Amino acid sequence: MVANNDILIKFGNRVRELRKAQGLSQEAFAARCGLDRTYIGGVERGQRNIALRNVEIIAKTLNVSISELTQGISGEQQQ
């Protein structure tokens, strides 16, 4: 099992990785998501316990599925 903070940090790192791969700044990404830049920054640093609704918004904005967005963060082996 992954510690709560670890999963938030891993999720934030994944969001940052995908955002940067698309060449988006935090500000531009936040605007596309309809979320505040400081909120996105907190998510990326693992400081926000993100709501499932916002996970969906982020995934759609990044053009990935929720499972692609969360890939590799649970600490469990993918099958």
Which functions belong to the PLM regions below?
Residues 1-21:
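A short, Lys/Arg-rich alpha-helix, primarily the initiator
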Residues 2, 70-79:
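Short, charged recognition helix plus adjacent turn
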Residues 53-68:
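DNA major-groove recognition helix of helix-turn-helix/homeodomain DNA-binding modules
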Residues 20, 31, 60:
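Alpha-helical residues within the helix-turn-helix
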Residues 47-57, 78:
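Short, basic-rich loop-to-helix N-cap that marks the start of a DNA-contacting helix
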Residues 45, 64, 71:
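Short, conserved catalytic or interaction motifs in soluble domains
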Residues 23-45:
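Short alpha-helical DNA-recognition segment
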